[in-house]
A protein has these predicted regions:
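Structural alpha/beta core scaffold segments of enzyme domains
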Residues: 1-358, 362, 379-387
């Protein structure tokens, strides 16, 4: 076999990230707007700016993809760790030219997935081999296969700018985002993020300023992009939380007080009133509004359960952020120590408001897992690509 490099054969993720950074420093397509940010920022006494990047992220499930397939009596029978057995059945049927009723998928324990096993490529591989060989076939990927042939979480770049009055109050707010869309995995020639992706922690940012603007940029998809846990909330939550802290530092106030100021005094966040095509995770805003009081309650809970405002030894500090994802509200405070350039996490506290917790232990374990997953991304995550 002689393989061709394809259109992304020279893709370099580090260089691509630099290009995205330069792009988000320019005006993009407006996704939400109130007032006139560009006019107001010129009137501001001072401004704070920041750019944040997130590299491609692999899923790295504890158990790599695996599937067993057996074609017998005109039936393709599959045993696989899949998150979407209906989709796996449909893809296998399409690949082999079989009726859907001729494909049976037995769902095994996932062994971790985080979105990776919603894609059935490894199932199709086993089914194809079993169909051609007419014997049972078991396929299991090595960790190297898993990392190299993942559907990665999107690489991204974000730009933020805030304008401050003479008294230090924030009067103007700008956010820009750029990342390859998941839709590019299914349809060619799509470069812009969907409204659903922009609804994940971007156009629904709970920022209440008189002048604000949210813009998106296009981005090429050079590798396969897929779902990973909270999807676009991963990079949007990181960018927003980091910048709120930057503004707090510029104002010399506590980050929790900075959040309170930016949340304002309204009862709900209404992105659709500012022109956003907001999807709210497919839920009704009447039933699941974005409630400001729930954000503020989380701040109070985390402050009360930690000593985050106490004096700390040299080299230690507390970080705080919060986010709404899939209609649940989460706040986290983290105490870290930096020694010789190495970040050591000493303590983490999380509060969640997910409404009625039918199984509190399950909610607790979910948040514990999210903490570990988030720390992995922040401290050790990331995939680089060179020569495609």
């Amino acid at each position: 076999l002689e393989w061709r490099d394809g259109g992304s054969g020279d893709h370099d993720s580090i260089e691509f990230s630099r290009e995205m950074v330069e792009k988000v420093k320019t005006k993009g397509s407006v996704a939400r707007e109130r007032g006139d940010f560009y006019k107001q920022i010129k009137r501001s006494t001072r401004s704070v700016e920041a750019v944040y990047t997130v590299p491609y992220q692999p899923h790295q499930p504890m158990e790599p993809p695996a599937a067993t397939a057996w074609f017998h009596d005109g039936i393709m029978e599959v045993w696989a760790c899949v998150q979407n057995p209906q989709s796996a059945r449909d893809e296998v049927a399409s690949l082999l030219g079989l009726a859907k009723r001729k494909v049976v998928v037995h769902v095994t324990l996932l062994g971790g997935a985080f979105g990776r096993k919603s894609k059935a490529d490894f199932v199709c591989e086993a089914a194809y081999l079993a169909h051609r060989s007419r014997r049972p076939v078991k396929v299991f990927w090595s960790r190297e296969d898993d990392i190299k042939h993942d559907y990665y979480h999107a690489i991204s770049a974000q730009y933020y700018q805030a304008g401050l009055d003479a008294d230090g109050s924030v009067n103007a707010w700008l956010q820009r985002t750029s990342f390859p869309t998941i839709a590019s995995t299914f349809t060619r020639m799509i470069w812009w993020p969907s409204a659903g992706e922009l609804s994940q922690g971007f156009v629904d940012a709970p920022i209440d300023t008189q002048h604000q603007r949210f813009e998106s940029h296009s981005a090429d998809a050079h590798v396969r992009i897929g779902w990973m846990r909270s999807v676009a909330n991963i990079h949007h939550g990181f960018g927003l939380g980091s910048f709120v802290d930057e503004v707090a530092v510029a104002k010399a106030i506590r980050v929790t007080d900075m959040w309170r100021e930016l949340l304002g005094n309204r009862s709900t966040v209404t992105p659709e009133e500012d022109g956003a095509d907001y999807k709210n995770y497919g839920e009704s805003l009447d039933r699941y509004p974005i409630e400001v009081k729930r954000f503020k309650n989380l701040i109070d809970v985390v402050e009360a359960s930690t000593d985050m405002h106490a004096n700390l030894p040299k080299g230690q500090g507390w970080g705080f952020s919060m986010h709404r994802s899939f209609a649940s509200y989460v706040a986290v405070a983290t105490r870290v120590e930096i020694a010789d350039g190495v970040v050591k996490v000493l303590d983490m506290h999380a509060a969640i408001d997910c409404g009625l917790a039918v199984n509190p232990d399950r909610v607790k374990s979910q948040i514990e897992g999210a903490m570990v997953f988030g720390l992995t991304i922040a401290l050790m995550g990331g995939i680089s690509v060179k020569q495609g």
